[in-house]
């Protein structure tokens, strides 16, 4: 019985070492562009972003830079907008499935209305936005995908999903 246990352990280690040698799928080529559009919750909002592959083989993945425009309604009488540059590290697990980490920083504008006891007062302010997302993307066609991301920035959605067009 001891011998069978040793054989089983050796077989398991051999399988693990063989599967560890499996190669990741080829990453996106330099010059590939991706346009994303989506909606988010917590708080409700919408996003449009653009990514451009600048390095196609970086730590077994690809590195993109781009920009993002976000809109949200964090509270009943409040709206927020931001324009941010973004940097993303992506890794193709299969030809159809990609995981990524994104960092953003930029400028946000918030406007809101409140009652001061005698009249409605409208005001706004500008602030620095910074945040990040961890997400995934699944291509069900060569150039069309769905994506989901979790993370966020102050006043903007913590969970968002949408579609991506790769060209």
Language-model features, listed with the residues they occupy:
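Cleavable N-terminal export/targeting peptides
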Residues: 1-28
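Residue-level signature of outer-membrane beta-barrel architecture
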Residues: 39-41, 52, 71, 89-91, ...
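Sequence/structural signature of outer-membrane beta-barrel proteins
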Residues: 57, 69-76, 92-94, 107-114, ...
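Residues that define the transmembrane beta-barrel architecture of outer-membrane proteins
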Residues: 31-33, 42-46, 61-63, 77-83, ...
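Short loop/turn motifs that connect adjacent beta-strands in outer-membrane beta-barrel proteins
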Residues: 23-32, 55-63, 77, 92-99, ...
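Flexible, solvent-exposed loop segments that connect beta-strands
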Residues: 24-33, 67-83, 107-129
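Transmembrane beta-strand segments that form the barrel wall of outer-membrane beta-barrel proteins
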Residues: 29-41, 62-73, 105-107, 143-154
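Outer-membrane beta-barrel "beta-signal"
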Residues: 50, 155-167
């Amino acid at each position: 019985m001891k011998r069978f246990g040793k054989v089983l352990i050796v077989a398991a280690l051999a399988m693990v070492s063989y599967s560890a040698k499996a190669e990741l799928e080829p990453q996106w080529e330099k010059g590939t562009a991706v346009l994303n559009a989506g909606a988010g919750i917590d708080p409700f909002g919408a996003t449009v972003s653009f990514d451009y592959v600048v390095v196609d083989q970086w730590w077994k993945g690809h590195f993109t830079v781009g920009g993002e425009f976000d809109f949200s309604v964090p509270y009943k009488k409040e709206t927020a907008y931001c324009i941010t540059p973004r940097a993303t590290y992506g890794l193709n697990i299969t030809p159809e499935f990609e995981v990524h980490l994104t960092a953003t920083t930029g400028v946000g504008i918030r406007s809101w209305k409140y009652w001061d006891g005698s009249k409605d007062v409208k005001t706004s302010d500008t602030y620095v936005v910074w945040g990040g997302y961890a997400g995934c993307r699944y291509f069900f066609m060569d150039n069309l995908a769905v994506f989901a991301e979790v993370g966020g920035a102050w006043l903007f959605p913590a969970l968002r999903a949408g579609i991506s067009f790769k060209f």
